[in-house]
Amino acid sequence: MLPREIVVSDDASTDNTVALVQETITRCGMADTIHLTVLRNDPPLGVTRNFEQAIEATRCPLIALCDQDDVWHAGRLARMVSPFRQRADLLLLHSDARLVDDALAPLGSTLFHALEVKPSELVAIQAGAAFEIFLRRNLVTGATTVFRRSLLGAALPFPAEWVHDEWLAAIASATGRMDVLVEPLIDYRQHASNQIGVRKPTLADKIVKAVAPRGDKHRKRLGRAEALLQRLTLLGGAVPDSHLQAQLGKVAHQRFRADLPANRRARIPSVLAEALRGRYERFDRGLQSVAQDLLERG
């Protein structure tokens, strides 16, 4: 299966991207069958705004994101389009990916392994409980994603606080049904020039993160949670009340974390109380986030 159209939004690149795309389409004999739209940015818009521009320029009912220089496996589109034909309620579908180096040599791992995705998380998404999973963390990578264009009615405009793929997943999980395919359907390159890369964190990485300065990251997370709450509120009846109430709880939890005192000893009673209420487990990474709040330097 081939795409009906390709939208290229070139964010002020210097590697001849547009010419390469046009040359490839012509060489493969697809110039008469695939509609090509080329957008050029100068100055650059940045990752999220550039994707928003490209997505808005599409015309087809299903949109497959393709960023950086990742490689789709043969049959990837057909595999991902099929569930949309079978399920009218499906808004977004994503998959695993094989991690490769810049020469496409497999690195012996997958995206889900690097992200430490739990089987229980995948089962919950497949069972229709994706919003509960995304209250804790995002599992969707844009390069593995296909979604209905109709999702844009609720998702646009993308807020500045969010990355495009995380936002699309959050809105899809809040307003309808999303799903996940556990098989890797693309090769996801890892190299120095990646805009966004991934690797499984080591124990040392986690310790460094736990004791790192708090900085403004919790304020940023609060801003993200508030932006999503604002959008869900605006969407009204399209969002189940249970999701809205859950997001209110997420905002309260993120505000709690953002307002913790600089003195680590002073945090202990309130952090333990928040943990006993189950909010770290529901809205964050459980004991890992508890340890972070107890150990982070103010």
Predicted regions: what they are:
Residues M1-P201:
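Nucleotide-sugar donor-binding/catalytic module of glycosyltransferases
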Residues F134, A160-W162, E166-W167, M178, ...:
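C-terminal subregions of glycosyltransferases and related glycan-biosynthesis enzymes
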